[in-house]
């Protein structure tokens, strides 16, 4: 399925925050690829908020992001990180379409994916996303397994990088000899590594998952659609 391989690994990180710089450098070092979900209406260093643990979280300025994320995929995360089910259909459509359009203009690549802000969605949101040209959208509901999604517009990840069993899941994935395609899908926010002071955790994850000849390393779009 993936250049003849039966296993694939992909990553998904949200919000376009300053910590993405370190994360991208690490991912590039280990030869893995991911998808970064951005809010084009909020992409500014001046857009800052305070985490409950006291850390100030900054988004990055737009300048230089095309070069930073080169080799990875850019996906929508809605114009203003809106909690979509709380809004009317026109607002939902605008949040998705405007973000998609802005990102395509800034990065020069088609935007076919999305991550639901706050992980919230309903049938109306899914239908509007599909009508807006979104082909897949990630939730925050972990599966704890490696099957491919039946409905890409409600794409549930394998796990979050902070899940207690993430290393055990990686070991299970690596040991699996299933004849069915197996996908390890990890998600999170890069600022969490500063908040939790556990960049070493991501280093360990990348060391375990990378460098396997039998695994395809791709963006969300590549592992889902082969393109």
Listing of model-derived features with the role each one plays in the protein:
Residues 15-18, 117-121, 161-162:
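Short beta->alpha connector loops
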Residues 1-2, 29-31, 40, 104, ...:
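C-terminal domain-boundary segment and adjacent tail
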Residues 11-12, 76, 136-138, 147-171, ...:
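Glycan-processing catalytic domains of CAZymes
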Residues 22-26, 124-128, 201, 205:
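A short acidic, amphipathic alpha-helical/loop segment
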Residues 28-125, 130-135, 142-155, 182-193:
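Metal-dependent polysaccharide deacetylase catalytic core of the NodB/CE4 family, i.e.
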Residues 1-19:
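Boundary/entry segment of secreted carbohydrate-active catalytic domains
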Residues 13-16, 78, 190, 220:
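Active-site metal-binding loops of divalent metal-dependent hydrolases
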């Amino acid at each position: 399925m993936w250049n003849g391989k039966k296993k694939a690994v992909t990553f998904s990180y949200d919000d376009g925050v300053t910590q993405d710089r370190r994360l991208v450098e690490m991912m590039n070092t280990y030869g893995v690829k991911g998808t970064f979900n951005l809010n084009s209406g909020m992409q500014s260093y001046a857009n800052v908020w305070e985490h409950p643990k006291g850390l100030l979280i900054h988004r990055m300025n737009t300048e230089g992001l095309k070069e930073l994320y080169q080799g990875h995929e850019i996906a929508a995360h809605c114009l203003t990180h809106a909690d979509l089910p709380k809004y009317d259909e026109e607002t939902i459509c605008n949040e998705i379409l405007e973000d998609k359009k802005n990102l395509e203009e800034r990065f020069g690549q088609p935007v076919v994916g999305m991550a639901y802000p706050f992980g919230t969605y309903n049938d109306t949101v899914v239908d509007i996303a599909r009508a807006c040209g979104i082909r897949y959208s990630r939730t925050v509901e972990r599966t704890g397994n490696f099957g491919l999604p039946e409905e890409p517009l409600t794409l549930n990840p394998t796990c979050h990088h902070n899940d207690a069993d993430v290393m055990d899941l990686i070991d299970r994935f690596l040991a699996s000899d299933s004849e069915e395609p197996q996908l390890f899908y990890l998600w999170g926010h890069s600022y969490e590594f500063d908040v939790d002071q556990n960049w070493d955790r991501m280093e360990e994850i990348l060391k375990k998952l990378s460098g396997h000849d039998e695994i395809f390393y791709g963006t969300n779009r590549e592992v889902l659609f082969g393109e």
